[in-house]
Amino acid sequence: MQDQYILALDQGTTSSRAMLFDRQGNIVSIAQKEFEQIYPQPGWVEHDPQEIWSTQAGVAAEAVTRVGLNGTAIAAIGITNQRETTIVWDRETGHPIYNAIVWQDRRTADFCDKLKAQGLSEKVRAKTGLPIDSYFSATKIRWILDNVEGAREKARQGKLAFGTVDSWLVWNFTKHELHVTDVTNASRTMLFNIHTLDWDDELLDALEIPRSMLPQVRASSEIYGPTKTTVFASKIPLAGIAGDQQAALFGQMCTSSGMVKNTYGTGCFLMMNTGETPIESRNNLVTTIAWQVDGKVSYALEGSIFIAGAVVQWLRDGLGIIKSASEIEALAAGVPHTDGVYLVPAFAGLGAPHWNARARGSLFGVTRGTTSAHLARAALDSIAYQSLDVLKAMEADSGIRIGELRVDGGASANNLLMQFQADLLGVDAVRPRITETTALGAAYLAGLAIGYWQNVDELHSQWQLERRFAPSMQAEQVGSCLAGWQRAVRAAKAWADDTQ
């Protein structure tokens, strides 16, 4: 009998990817295809749902055939996806009635302000763990119902279906038979009660969204049903679903309360496992569901940083200081420190834990002696400082002292950044051998559901360290660095306040 593999589908914001994993958690094959970003007007971001499906189906087939395999070699499929992105389709035709409204889209910001003015903020946070924000799916659904001709009436008749990207993929993989999502994706809609684990009728009424549109909510690791498309000749169990950041937390094996991961991408996404009890944040973090496995729900605290790796892209594209992102480490390493220069990369405001939409990027402490190397180092340092702000908020909310930080994402390959992160935190930054942790998490969830892997203990034994960064900076020096950063953030906020 031929070896079998787990196929992980990683449907991201800019590309659809597919990876095959073997029993040791190694990547056997990978395929990727980018798709179009649609910007109808400033602040609006859309995707074509049919292109999401066609690119994802295409790379799924390519990842399998590239290594001479076919569908019979796939034991199960796990799906992970860009979260919050909203698709509404006609149940009869299977066709979307509007483009996917992407998580970054801000068109419903004014409507969110109206909901806040109605005094709904505390109710929404208590039920969903989320602040009222256009980032989440609820107001995007409402916009489609209000602005697409005939949508409201079709919804009333039960003819429309809503789904996050995972739901849309499962719907298509099962030839329109399964309309499901998992608890992690449901918890990002602003409509799901994370305590009762059900859609919340009070919130649905407040937003005038019919319950009939919503998918059935299932666990993150269970057999939802078999594929029925021509993508694969054989029927393969769809057996794992989780939003991208939750999948990364699972792929990093942060399965115990107090374990934390940071994904260093264009932005940073930090997530702390808080165990089987949701912790309501008092420090501007989001309370969310980490996963549901073996009947148990794990919760998490999450903080999002808008600009992380994007600050390196700005040095490349905006200032021309570097020709490629990979050059920044060598340039920054040319100086021992920033010489008092601080960059606050609030290009689109400040995310967690500040949540200041008006703050703008600011540079402080520049002298005639400041060089491109100092700027490069300040840019890298800003990623670590912002991450520290979120991690301190997590410690304050949870009462848990972080033992180590598990890192992944593109910028985690930067050794200078990882060392400075460890220095600031005072604990080790730990980089795994396999940094494709999002796809790995989806594979793990699917494999557990079908018995490909026996239990989480087996997965823990597979997790392998690539490098551990131990703190080496003196406490006095760390304190001085942090004091400067905090002054810079205060000044960036003051600048925004003074320009209203």
Curated annotation (Swiss-Prot):
Gene Ontology molecular functions: ATP binding; glycerol kinase activity
Positions of glycerol binding: 83-84, 135, 244-245
Enzyme class: transferase
Biological-process GO terms, alphabetical: glycerol catabolic process; glycerol metabolic process; glycerol-3-phosphate metabolic process
Alphabetized SUPFAM superfamilies for the sequence: Actin-like ATPase domain (SSF53067)
NCBIfam families: glycerol_kin, PRK00047.1
Protein's job: Key enzyme in the regulation of glycerol uptake and metabolism. Catalyzes the phosphorylation of glycerol to yield sn-glycerol 3-phosphate.
Similarity-based family: Belongs to the FGGY kinase family.
Protein name as catalogued: Glycerol kinase
Protein's organism: Burkholderia pseudomallei (strain K96243)
